[in-house]
Amino acid sequence: DYYKKWYRPDLQSVIVVGDIKPAEVEAKIKRLFGNIPRAKYAAERIYYPVNDNDRMIVATDRDSEQPIMLANLYMKHDVVPDRDKSDISYLRDSYMESLIISMLNARLQELQQQAVPPFLSATAHAGQFLVSRTKDAFRLSFGCRQENVKGSFDAVIAESERARRYGFTESELRRAQERQMKVAERQYTERNDRRNRYFVTKALQNFLSAEPIVTEAFRLEQFRLFTRTVTLEQVNSAAKKLISDKNQVLVVYAPDKPEFNLPSNDTLERYV
């Protein structure tokens, strides 16, 4: 059955966080779990690829408890191989990606300050594509105005496309870097006040997806280096790769109400 097939030592990890004596805890873990035999005919764990797509994939769903129309536009790209995540270039690329997300979100927040904003909410993200381990994605998530769904799409898509085509400015980059440094400095200052959950999360990310575990001091040192050496040209070049007009998937959740007119899939595709 499912339990016997997948709950086995070679796919599991024991994570212990707290004020412990490491040698004693390690010995106890080995004593409790060390004699569990490996499965003779273990099923291979396969990370299935997510295919690329030329034409946008559109999926919609209605729910009576969904209060507004929420759109999620994904732009897929291949993941960084686990073996490359220990390289300093991975931390540098992640730093530039976070700058791009920060600057685009600042632009979207500025639009939302209008007297009548074109959308109810809008944020940009970067990370795992749904539950896939073979694709990551840049994502635009936005709440649409019921009386002007197209206007909401137009505003969000136009802002991301403007960033892709023309990039960001030196002043935008400087402000984003200042925000990043403040976060890194705060994390360093609070490094001795972390709750156990923080360390558990870091260990889980390392075990499940090979995310590197670095100290707050190391991260702060690297961010200072990146702030001095990363250029606007490099960030704008990375933005062109992250924000793409290819490999797009649009997922829309809408209210299940007679008065709400959900556009057809073809119409939603044209909006983008």
Description of each model-found segment:
Residues V230-T231, A238, L242-V272:
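Segments forming glycine/polar-rich beta-alpha architectures that bind adenosine-containing cofactors
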